[in-house]
Amino acid sequence: MKDDIALNINPLVSYLKKPKNEFTKADIIKFIEEKEIKMLAFRYVAGDGKLKSLNFVITNREHLEQILSCGERVDGSNIFPAFMHAGSSDLYVIPRFNTAFMDPFSEIPTISFLCSYFNKDGQPMENSPEYILKKAAESFKKVTNMSFQAM
């Protein structure tokens, strides 16, 4: 296990000395502050299958803690026009800490996250690609007793 961490290509894993599935908000904040990271990028898949991005300049710790805890509101009717109507389209993209990585293409030091969709009540959005895939994987495991390692 130590070799997996020491030789890991993700700078967050090697710096924090823990596997990515154990990352916490406090770990991410520590890395951001000590490495002087300037931006966050929230990445999420829209209904059309395209990867979208929301970028945030880190202005202060309070804002950083809020955005990592609560995510950001997005208009679901633009992202999932087939499923959501403009009147009831509040969604939140919440970062999954275990997906954090340094963006190798950004000129500004940036940490990117893959995000999950949640509704205004804090429940996962059932029509999101991630949720559908998760449910399919659970059904597959229940029937076959096998699981997908890529997930």
Sequence positions of predicted segments:
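ATP/Mg2+-dependent ligation/transfer catalytic cores
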Residues: 1-151
